[in-house]
Amino acid sequence: VRPRPWPLLSKTETKNGERHVWTTFSEDQVDLNWKSPDVLFEFLDILLNYVSKGTRIVRLDAVAFLWKEEGTSCIHLRQVHEVVKLMRDVLVTVAPHVIVLTETNVPHVENISYFGRGDEAHMVYQFALPPLVLHGLLKGDSRSMQKWAGSLGDLPKGCTYLNFTASHDGIGVRPLEGLVAPEELRWLVGQVEERGGLVNYRSMPDGSKKPYELNITYLDALSLPGDPKLGLRRFLCSQAVMLSLRGMPAVYFHSVVGGTNWDEGPKREDGENRDINRQRWDWNDLEAKLDDADSDHAWVNNVYSSMLRTRANCTAFHPDAPQEVLT
């Protein structure tokens, strides 16, 4: 289940000499020992400091991997849920307006477990949405997406989804497990690679590797060779689907401005595959593109902005509003 292909332990120099430390994600991101009361209380202090500065949403990044126990998968352990509950309890006591958001890029059933019984996260990322919408629009077949959307039951009171299609990370494909056939996932990977995308893998227990995320701008992922305008419309259709679903939308900046693959990013000295969707814009250059009425950037930005205004002014899109999927 570990989301990376490189070694789990990283050699580190400490005041006591060389040590090997646990690094679930990368050597520059060392895991901490949450069994230590000092670690737990330090993070509660950090949490409260953020709240004192006006934080309204607290994002618990990759929280599923927080706790380690020998002989287990070290993911989704009971203690992880207890820590999330503790943070929720603290916030209910001192800052009940603050929202707890969990980020767990895992299959759907595992993902929504972080709602608990309405006593853990207020919101969870809707990780199945980005790959399902992409698959449906590229395939011209919405059945998998319709079946999944129709299966979304009622949530605990005060809970909702954070809907998105793109972010600073890649498009996670683990959430497709159980929703589309393995051969459909392989087809989707091929489609993304044909459009200039890059694939990140994870290591399996048998030493093999499986796709973990697709790195590409969502606009380029839906591009249509030979008919770029239709590709843009297909991209905007994907955003309309995301904006229409029950929950709260999370809109990625590069999507709003019609960003395309930043091929230079991964090739930089400090680059990684995800940088293809993290272009570092020059403000004057971007402003010129958005001011040019004939540019794709301006057209996408204008249509997208119009959709956002429409959504904001319609009470039917309140996170607590009921929703029915018609097929």
Residue ranges and their predicted role:
Residues 1-327:
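Active-site and adjacent substrate-binding regions of carbohydrate-active enzymes
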